[in-house]
């Protein structure tokens, strides 16, 4: 058994509404707003696509999701040979880490970011440098200072989970200019569809100038397919060819591929979802207490407080399950009535 596994624990999902009702003695409905899921669900066209292909369940999937790869290739205008799929971005991160890292290698990322970068590096006996956040966001200059000849991967999350903060196109461009070209920079844009900032990076454009800039995206968030597990990376052909050796043969299911294609085709529905999210997100920042909130470009708001357990409990008492952190609470933006209840709590909470 790998000794480094003793440094880790298995991922612990939030408690279910039923478990929380029992633990806290709550009656009435509880709304799960802890995992940044799209509360509006997927496009109706996804449900139609799933139903129309149920008779194919006894077939193995087509390895590599060729139909979905071609659909993304056409929509984003990238060569299909540069796209690799995983069962969610969790598996993509695992495959990249397994393919790239050897014992003693080093990854650089941030504190208070998505935990799978750290987790998979430790599994591969790599060292992890976590640079503290600066004003709630990635300290890109601080990360540059940590690069040395042991650095094998750099992980960025934009917008960052759990803070919702982002760095701009110019900031990313200047960062990439200073990173040695042989070090892959993985840019996780799981929440990109929710972004409204005009200066958010055009990472696909930056890839034209930086061969080591690799982009990760998912169907779990804005497209509402978290339960079907479809994520992907757009990288150089050489990198994809190597990483594909690690990919399990049938990792993305047949139904998941059909569902993702249907979701991708319904851009009008995606636009409706992201506009609703933007409107509801803005409501949180219209109250004076928003001085305690980190600015978000995602479908969640991070509330800073030294009394995070008390805030979590207060939100739970109005029927909303959120995500507890030592220095705050992350609130997934819900339906209007759910958000209104949470905003009332936030207005009267003592931070």
From Swiss-Prot:
The modification N6-(pyridoxal phosphate)lysine is found at residue 221. GO terms for biological process: L-histidine biosynthetic process. Its cofactor is pyridoxal 5'-phosphate. It catalyses: L-histidinol phosphate + 2-oxoglutarate = 3-(imidazol-4-yl)-2-oxopropyl phosphate + L-glutamate. Signal peptide: none annotated. InterPro entries: Aminotrans_II_pyridoxalP_BS (IPR001917), Aminotransferase_I/II_large (IPR004839), HisP_aminotrans (IPR005861), HistidinolP_aminotransfase (IPR050106), PyrdxlP-dep_Trfase (IPR015424), PyrdxlP-dep_Trfase_major (IPR015421), PyrdxlP-dep_Trfase_small (IPR015422). Its EC number is 2.6.1.9. Pfam families: Aminotran_1_2. Keywords: Amino-acid biosynthesis, Aminotransferase, Histidine biosynthesis, Pyridoxal phosphate, Transferase. Pathway: Amino-acid biosynthesis; L-histidine biosynthesis; L-histidine from 5-phospho-alpha-D-ribose 1-diphosphate: step 7/9. Belongs to the class-II pyridoxal-phosphate-dependent aminotransferase family. Histidinol-phosphate aminotransferase subfamily. Homodimer. This is Histidinol-phosphate aminotransferase. It comes from Staphylococcus epidermidis (strain ATCC 12228 / FDA PCI 1200). The gene is hisC.
């Amino acid at each position: 058994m790998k000794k480094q596994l003793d440094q880790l624990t298995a991922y612990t999902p939030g408690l279910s509404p039923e478990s929380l009702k029992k633990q806290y003695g709550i009656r009435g409905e509880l709304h799960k707003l802890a995992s940044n899921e799209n509360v509006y669900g997927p496009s109706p066209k996804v449900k139609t696509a799933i139903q129309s292909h149920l008779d194919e369940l006894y077939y193995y999937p087509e390895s590599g999701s060729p139909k979905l790869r071609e659909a993304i290739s056409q929509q984003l205008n990238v060569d299909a040979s540069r796209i690799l799929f995983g069962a969610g971005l969790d598996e993509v991160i695992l495959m990249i880490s397994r393919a790239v890292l050897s014992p003693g290698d080093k990854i650089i990322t941030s504190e208070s970011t998505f935990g799978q970068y750290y987790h998979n590096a430790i599994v591969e006996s790599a060292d992890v440098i976590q640079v503290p956040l600066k004003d709630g966001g990635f300290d890109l200059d601080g990360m540059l200072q940590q690069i040395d000849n042991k650095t094998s991967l750099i992980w960025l999350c934009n917008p960052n989970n759990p803070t919702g903060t982002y760095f701009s196109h110019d900031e990313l461009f200047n960062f990439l200019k200073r990173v040695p070209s042989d070090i892959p920079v993985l840019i996780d844009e799981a929440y990109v569809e929710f972004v409204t900032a005009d200066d958010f990076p055009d990472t696909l454009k930056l890839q034209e100038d930086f061969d080591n800039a690799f982009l990760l995206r998912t169907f779990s968030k804005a497209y509402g397919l978290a339960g079907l597990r479809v994520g992907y990376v757009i990288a150089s052909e050489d990198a994809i060819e190597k990483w594909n050796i690690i990919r399990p043969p049938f990792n993305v299911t047949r139904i998941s591929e059909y569902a993702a294609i249907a979701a991708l085709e319904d851009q009008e529905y995606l636009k409706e979802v992201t506009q609703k999210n933007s409107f509801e997100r803005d409501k949180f920042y219209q109250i004076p207490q928003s001085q305690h909130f980190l600015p978000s470009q995602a479908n969640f708001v991070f509330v800073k407080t030294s009394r995070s357990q008390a805030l979590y409990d207060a939100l739970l008492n109005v029927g909303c399950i959120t995500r507890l952190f030592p220095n705050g609470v992350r609130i997934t933006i819900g339906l209007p009535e759910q958000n209104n209840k949470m905003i009332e709590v936030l207005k009267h909470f003592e931070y």
